[in-house]
């Protein structure tokens, strides 16, 4: 398909090559991966139905963390063990709220989440289990 765009990146631990696949300007995407050490290996499908957007945040061994709008129009953070990737095995790390998630970073074992609240950005920090830690006040 000529409209498919392929965006490869390597996980922060250097163990996996992840392939983000999108079609045109559609925000929904597919995710494939393979171990870096397996140079001739095939990509493994993780999300391949173009049913939602999945944006990789980080991984801990075989658990990949994503921001997704799957069943959450304002987005949520999920953990997916690539050894058991079925939806029933997903762990929700941060539930969807009324304010949409704009961006997520994982720094020093904490999620830094930017929300859009009444057309203004809010920054909140959550621990690695998804528990609220604090809000960072932004300049006005």
Regions found by a protein language model. Name each.
Residues 1-140:
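Peripheral, non-catalytic segments that deliver or gate enzyme domains
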């Amino acid at each position: 398909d000529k409209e498919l765009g392929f965006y490869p990146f390597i996980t922060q631990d250097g163990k996996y090559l992840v392939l983000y696949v999108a079609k045109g300007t559609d925000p929904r995407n597919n995710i494939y991966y393979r171990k870096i050490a397996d140079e001739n290996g095939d990509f493994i499908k993780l999300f391949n139905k173009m049913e939602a957007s999945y944006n990789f945040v980080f991984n801990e061994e075989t658990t990949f963390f994503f921001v997704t709008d799957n069943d959450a129009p304002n987005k949520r953070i999920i953990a997916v063990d690539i050894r058991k990737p079925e939806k029933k095995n997903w762990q929700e790390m941060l539930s969807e709220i009324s304010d949409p998630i704009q961006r997520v970073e994982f720094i020093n074992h904490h999620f830094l989440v930017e929300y859009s609240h009444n057309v203004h950005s809010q920054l909140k920090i959550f621990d690695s289990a998804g528990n609220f830690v604090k809000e960072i006040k932004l300049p006005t």
